[in-house]
Amino acid sequence: AANLENDFDNVNEQLQDALSKITLLEEDLERNEERLQTATERLEEASKYIAEDAERKLAITEVDLERAEARLEAAEAKSLEISEQEASQREDSYEETIRDLTQRLKTVSKLQKEVDRLEDELLAEKEKYKAISDELDQTFAELAGY
């Protein structure tokens, strides 16, 4: 009877240890789910921001293009009257537009890299979540074996 009681105590202690592990795994799982949710929300925000920013920049660029086309038509109509100085000023304007568009392209590229980084972070969090879930499943399977 003492041996049976000792075996019972050992099994009970193992059960308590397993329950403690499950509790810790559940807490880890909850934290990882929260991190996954946060990363998903950040990714959605970044994607929305990039899309809105790209639309806004496209609209600005289209307006710039329309203005440039209008200036070009006016310049062609007055091409015989335009002085060397005015041609130089127009060239400066185009260079500024190129610099501006180049800067905008760099900004969009940086934002895309941030989206890529957030997607990578989201994938890593999903893999952590899967590992914890697998470990929890294994612990439950081990408990079922007792």
From Swiss-Prot:
Residues 76-95 are annotated as: Disordered. It comes from the Eukaryota. Keywords: Allergen, Coiled coil, Repeat. The keyword Coiled coil applies. Residues 1-146 form a coiled coil. Pfam families: Holin_BhlA, Tropomyosin. Tropomyosin, in association with the troponin complex, plays a central role in the calcium dependent regulation of muscle contraction. The molecule is in a coiled coil structure that is formed by 2 polypeptide chains. The sequence exhibits a prominent seven-residues periodicity. Belongs to the tropomyosin family. Homodimer. This is Tropomyosin. It comes from Turbo cornutus.
